[in-house]
Amino acid sequence: MSHRQSCDRCRQQKVRCLRDEALGGESNPVSPGRSSLSPCERCLKAGVDCVYSLKQRSNRRSVQTSIRRDTDPGSRNGSNASWLEQGLARPMYQGGPFLGADLGDLVGQFSGVGEGGPVASFNGWDANLQPFSPTLFSSLVAPVGTNTGPISTAPSTTDGGHDSEEIDDNRDPTDALSSQLTSLGQRARRAMRRLVLPDRTPLTVSSPEVNEALEDTNTLIRIMNKITAPDRDDITIFPTTTNYSLAFSALACHQHLVALFRAICDAIHRCLQSQKEPRQRHNRSGQTSDVGPSSVAQFVMVLQLLMHLINRMDRSLFQSTSSMRHGSRISVSTGSHLAPVTPSTANHVTPDPTRIEAAAGSSVPPGGLLVLVQDIVETIPNEHEKLRQVIQKLQTEMEHSELH
């Protein structure tokens, strides 16, 4: 058995062993545990013995030897059988055949089957079953060009009549308009709450509340035009040109916007009234007013915008007699038709005091929801006219104001 080519110290330190062959047997005589190799330079410098150990035989077998032994079809049940042979040598079931490493027994006959007796592990198994036909799965491996019959992708009609797709509410234009009207009413109420906050700056044309009043009025007018437009796609038994639920929602949104217009006028009126207080009071408190000539000019433009929006809503509400044919009011008690209310006839409409008291919650018994709604609709032209008068009064007040 030969010695290693590196000394034990260099192998332990995992460095290269440097030797001087000229110093072979003189400085390192042969002795037990030592070889005839010359000592390495590292051991000489360290002053230690340079020892070369003998090579040891490795007990690990190579991968090729393991594979060759495991797949050797030699003895199957002997003591030298590999793990693969021992695993395959076990029967698949009780009383079944043994399977060897060459898998040759797989094509043999199973004991007990076909001999007239039942197999212990297959009680109840039909031994007369026919083998699978080779052509049974031919369609699975058919060429691409072979006509194997089209696969139907049509929805099944045996689902009890229910739609296979879920209904999308966003596709319904009526629901979309209803959502827009609800959002407009909420925006108007939030704007009115902001207008009554204390210590707020005077309104201008670019104030958020004024911008919302302009945008929401344009949106409401566009929705009202859609509601009153004829629906040519309506093929129902009772065709109508107006969706009544949307009409009531639009009227409710109109009332919110009119209330917002009135709140804007009230905010301007409060600012103007604050300037009529004695100047001595402001001098004692040391406060200066934010309302000046520039604010008055902004007030004038805001009021002109409100007047323009009211006139536009008038034209949209009372477009023509033909567009109001489905909005003509019917008397609850007699069922007779009444003339549509237009701006020209608005001043001649006099609401019934009894109905107004009933709507206000007095002791007079109310006539029902229809009577209340009819009274509200009849007062819409009067509300517009009163709002115009308030705007004109504010404009006149600012013309004679001392802030110019």
From Swiss-Prot:
Residues 61-82, 147-177 are annotated as: Disordered. Residues 147-159 have a biased composition (Polar residues). It is found in: Nucleus. Gene3D superfamilies: Zn(2)-C6 fungal-type DNA-binding domain. Its main location: nucleus. It comes from the Eukaryota. GO terms for cellular component: nucleus. This is Transcription factor grgC. Signal peptide: none annotated.
